[in-house]
Design a protein with these regions (language model features):
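Short, solvent-exposed loop/turn segments at secondary-structure junctions
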Residues: 45-47, 83, 128-129, 221, ...
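Beta-sheet entry/capping signal
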Residues: 75, 119-121, 221-223, 256-258, ...
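Loop/helix patches that line or flank the sugar-binding groove of alpha-linked glycan CAZymes
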Residues: 329-332, 341-484
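Beta-strand-rich binding/interaction modules
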Residues: 482-502
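C-terminal beta-strand-rich structural cap/linker in extracellular carbohydrate-active enzymes
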Residues: 507-526
Length: 526
């Protein structure tokens, strides 16, 4: 490692503007039209209600596109929007329609068009592992099985849909449930009402190709693939083959089609799934309450550890698929929120967001994360609470009621959006600045870490990201107090600072003073 000396100092930094810094979000360069995006995950049910029924809808998302774009996000992931029996809609009854609670196909067409007009790419959740027990495929298969005599064998020619699922006359484990009125059991790993599909069936493969063609024809830019590890339990080779075949079909229809897959596992297992040649996997190795981002934000690990793990992760994935696009995130709809993991500590919550948005790839922000929204306990409904637009409880301002079984009286730790927008020190404005810095410097997302400089103090780290002729240097300070880093040999200038108290890094005589809990962006002097 290259060696630079860092000296920890105790004085409070004076807010002097460094070279090129404005203290405002950076100017956005002309957008690079590729699949590196800043994604915003939306649970439509709880986001924005356009018609006053208490449930979020597609028109509500469309109304908030300017908000999402101004925040700095240029990609949106919609959690499932297809007809379903549940509030979360992961039990799909029809893959080629919109749940009536959310609107219509025409509403989706309008949303797609408005997203594209604002240079926002729209991806939707695709649940390929299972369907609803109310899906016509499953109903037809069960009706056929119930019609069989005790000694009569299944004939796929009589009912092709029997081949769409896993059926057996034996209850192979506790994830198998009896088909009422028959001698057969079906597999349903997640829930009895979500029977698992048989993805080795050529007919099922063709069904999903038709489904993909339907959505691509309407203008959808990609799919978030749900539960890919569970396509065939414990069979990575089969699962990656399914993913690869499906992805290749999608890009044959739309060459820039994007796919990001859920592989809830450690780094090495995620790397195995990159053998599929699909572009992105969610980086669960860095996420969650015990992930590297949260640990660094709350001081359980330091800057040196964070950047080392980050570089190791990038190298691990790149060895398998050199064209991979990492998909880092902090938490999602299945996890307790960042606010809970960091005990409502505002500085730590901000810093976690800053760390995320300094990482390579396409980061994903869970709606409300930019406000420091809170969840409660292990109940999933409490991880999917209404977006906090304002304190107005009249029901006339688009605020949703949230899932029926959620605890709607949760006291949030931070102000609603309308107040945070006006507060330059808010979590919202921190996130907005972090995103705008990222957009102004495409090399942050696209570059690779090629150098970690030795600065002698583990709480301080300096890295270089580079891509072709472009490069950026990023200095991390994970401690509460400010510090100095001698960088005379690098001929750098500060282009922006992201700090929890809005103070700025100052470069003087080859020594940079960086605030506590800060990320400083530098480039070579021209």
């Amino acid at each position: 490692m290259k060696r630079i000396i860092a000296v920890v100092v105790s004085f409070v930094l004076v807010m002097i503007i460094g070279c090129g810094q404005t203290g405002e979000p950076g100017n956005i360069k002309e957008a690079v039209d590729d699949n590196y995006r800043n994604y915003y995950e939306v649970f439509v049910y709880s986001y924005f209600d356009s018609n006053g029924d208490g449930i979020g809808d597609l028109k509500g998302v469309e109304e908030k596109l300017d908000y999402i774009a101004d925040l700095g996000c240029n990609g949106i992931w919609l959690m499932p929007v297809m007809p379903s029996t549940t509030y979360h809609k992961y039990d799909v009854m029809d893959y080629c329609d919109i749940d009536k609670e959310y609107g219509t196909l025409e509403d989706m067409d309008s949303l797609i068009n408005e997203c594209h007009a604002k240079d926002i790419r729209l991806i939707i959740d695709l649940v390929m592992n299972h369907t609803s027990s109310k899906h016509p495929w499953f109903i037809a298969a069960c009706d056929y099985l119930k019609s069989l005599e005790a000694d009569e064998e299944i004939d796929i020619a009589e009912c092709p849909y029997v081949d769409y699922y896993h059926f057996s006359k034996e209850q192979l484990n506790n994830s198998w449930y009896r088909v009422p009125g028959s001698d057969y059991y079906y597999e349903a790993v997640f829930w009895s009402e979500m029977p698992d599909l048989n993805l080795s069936s050529e007919s099922v493969k063709q069904e999903f190709e038709s489904i993909a063609a339907f959505w691509i024809d309407r203008g959808i830019d990609g799919f978030r693939m749900d539960a890919t590890m569970h396509f065939e339990e414990g069979d990575t080779a089969f699962n990656t083959e399914v993913m690869n075949d499906f992805y290749e079909y999608c890009v044959s229809l739309k060459p820039d089609f994007y796919m990001v897959s859920e592989v809830w596992a450690n780094r090495d297992t995620i790397a195995d799934y990159y053998l599929s040649d699909t572009p992105s996997m969610f980086d669960f190795s860095m996420s969650g309450a015990e992930g590297e981002i949260i640990k660094a934000a709350r001081g359980n690990s330091n800057a040196e550890s964070f950047v080392t793990k980050l570089k190791e992760t990038e190298e691990t994935y790149r060895k398998v698929n050199e064209d991979y696009i990492n998909a880092p995130f902090i938490t999602n709809h299945d996890m307790s929120r960042v606010c809970n993991a960091l005990n409502s500590n505002e500085d730590d919550i901000k810093f976690a967001g800053g760390l995320l948005l300094s990482m390579g790839g396409s980061p994903f922000i869970y709606y409300g994360e930019e406000l420091g929204m809170k969840s409660k306990g292990k109940k999933d409904e409490n991880k999917r609470l209404p977006m906090q637009w304002s304190d107005d409880a009249s029901g006339m301002n688009g605020i949703c009621e949230g899932p029926l079984d959620s605890d709607r009286d949760i006291n949030q730790s931070f102000d609603t959006l309308d107040k945070q927008i006006e507060d330059e020190t808010s979590i919202y404005n921190y996130y907005r600045k972090a995103l705008h810095i990222r957009n102004a410097n495409p090399v942050i997302a696209r570059g690779t870490i090629d150098t970690i400089y030795d600065v002698t103090d583990g709480d301080i780290a300096l890295i270089r990201r580079s891509e072709l002729s472009d490069e950026i240097y990023i200095a991390y300070n994970t401690q509460e107090s400010s510090a100095e880093i001698a960088i005379q040999d690098l001929n750098l200038e500060v282009i922006d600072t992201l700090s929890v108290d809005n103070s700025l890094s100052v470069l003087k005589n080859g020594v940079i003073s960086v605030p506590g809990k800060s990320i400083t962006y530098l480039k070579r002097r021209q």
